[in-house]
UniProtKB/Swiss-Prot annotation:
GO cellular component, as recorded: small ribosomal subunit
Full protein name: Small ribosomal subunit protein uS2
Species name: Methanococcus maripaludis (strain C5 / ATCC BAA-1333)
UniProt record similarity statement: Belongs to the universal ribosomal protein uS2 family.
GO molecular function: structural constituent of ribosome
Keywords on record: Ribonucleoprotein, Ribosomal protein
One biological process term in Gene Ontology: translation
InterPro entries in the cross-refs: Ribosomal_uS2 (IPR001865), Ribosomal_uS2_arc (IPR023454), Ribosomal_uS2_CS (IPR018130), Ribosomal_uS2_euk/arc (IPR005707), Ribosomal_uS2_flav_dom_sf (IPR023591)
Superkingdom field: Archaea
Lineage summary: Archaea, Methanobacteriati, Methanobacteriota, Methanomada group, Methanococci
Regions annotated as coiled coil: none
Amino acid sequence: MSDENLLTTLDTYLASGIHIGTQQKTEDMRRFIYRVRADGLYVLDVRKTDERLRLAAKFLSNYEPEDIMAVTRRVYSVGPLKEFGKVTGINTVAGRFVPGTLTNPSAKKFAEPEVLFLSDPRVDKQALKEAIEIGIPVIGMCDTEHLTSHIDFIIPTNNKGRKSVSLMYYLIAREYMKNRGLIGEEVPFSYDQFLEKAMNVKVKMNPSNRQRGRFQRRRR
C-alpha cells in the first residue's frame, strides 16, 4: 500500500495503531477487517479507514461547528476530544453524558445538535440512545467488536488508544476546516503539535464539570 491519495502517510497511520483491532469481531465490522494476526487480533484495513475519515469530514463540513456535538466517555479520548473542539469550535462533551441532555428541554445542559459524533458508540450509549430518540444522524468511531445497527456512518478504527484517537480527531479537524474554507493547504497546526497538546490535557472526570457550557443553542 502506497501513501498516494491517503490523508497522511501510511507510516503515520501504522505508528498510531489505528489498524489494531481486538480479538473479537462482529458481522457488522467484517467488511472493514483486513486480516487476523497469529495472536488472534483482527487488523483493520487502513485504506478503508482513510476513505471513511475523508467522507466523515466532508459530511460534517455541511454543518456549523455549533450544530455538531462530539462526545466521549473514554479517559484516553478526553484530551484528543478537547483539542479537537478547541481547533474546530465544535462542541464537546467529555466524561459522563448527563441523561436528558438531548431530550429534556428543562435540563441544565440541554442542547439541540444536528449531528452527533461519538468516539465509542458502545461506551457512549446514553448519547447514542438520545440521538436515536430525537432522530439526528450519528457518526461513530467503531472497533472490530462493535455492533453498528444504530450508527449512520462508521469510521473503522482503534478507538481505545490515545495516539490512534488523536490521529482520527486531528485528520477530521483538518479536513473539516479545509472543506469549510477555514484553512488552506498550509495547515496552521501539525499532527505532532495536536498530539502533544492532547496528551498534556489534564483529565479530571468530575461529573459537575464534564460538559462544556458553550453549547447553549436557541430552544425552539
